[in-house]
């Protein structure tokens, strides 16, 4: 198949995770620095990671509100998806990512006993991994299309 890349898109960072070749597990890769205000989206680094990891599709988290409405961050994630689609011409899917960052922080506190400073360095990468793992577990449509 190839790997899927999961992305947790923020205004200053993008957490990146990739699946294994079978589409069973997700692993955090890194956090790419971006700056929405300056129109710097880290696409050169994403391109390197796409090539290194033989990525065949993207999964982006949509940070919906708890009442299932969409706010500005959902629109920003969709816009980032459009940038990826234009640059890479690879399929893209979205998954509801409500509470993945909260879950990631809880995991880091409870299981890793990580300090606040350490958590800040890895939380977006872990959130991207959770987004992608949830997608893989739900057998998202890209898995069906690419197999």
UniProtKB/Swiss-Prot annotation:
GO terms, molecular function: nuclease activity
GO biological process entries: rRNA 5'-end processing
Single GO cellular component term: cytosol
EC code(s) of this entry: 3.1.-.-
Subcellular location: Cytoplasm
Pfam families (alphabetical): RuvX
SMART domains linked to this entry: YqgFc
Leading EC class: hydrolase
Keywords linked to the UniProt accession: Cytoplasm, Hydrolase, Nuclease, Ribosome biogenesis
SUPFAM superfamilies documented for this protein: Ribonuclease H-like
Superkingdom of this protein's organism: Bacteria
InterPro entries on file: RNaseH-like_sf, YqgF, YqgF/RNaseH-like_dom, YqgF/RNaseH-like_dom_sf
Purpose: Could be a nuclease involved in processing of the 5'-end of pre-16S rRNA.
PANTHER family: POLYNUCLEOTIDYL TRANSFERASE, RIBONUCLEASE H-LIKE SUPERFAMILY PROTEIN
UniProt similarity note: Belongs to the YqgF nuclease family.
Name of protein: Putative pre-16S rRNA nuclease
Taxonomic lineage from the root: Bacteria, Bacillati, Bacillota, Bacilli, Lactobacillales
């Amino acid at each position: 198949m190839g790997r899927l890349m999961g992305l947790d898109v923020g205004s200053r960072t993008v957490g990146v995770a990739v699946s294994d070749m079978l589409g069973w597990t997700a692993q955090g890769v890194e956090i790419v620095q971006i700056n929405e205000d300056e129109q710097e989206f880290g696409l050169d680094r994403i391109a390197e990671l796409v090539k290194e990891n033989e990525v065949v599709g993207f999964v982006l988290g949509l940070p919906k509100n708890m009442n299932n409405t969409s706010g500005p961050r959902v629109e920003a994630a969709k816009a980032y998806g459009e940038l990826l689609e234009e640059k890479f011409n690879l399929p893209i899917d979205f998954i509801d990512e409500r509470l993945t960052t909260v879950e990631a922080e809880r995991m880091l506190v409870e299981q890793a006993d990580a300090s606040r400073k350490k958590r800040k360095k890895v939380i977006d990468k872990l959130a991207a991994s959770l987004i992608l793992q949830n997608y893989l577990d739900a057998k998202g449509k890209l898995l069906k299309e690419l197999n």
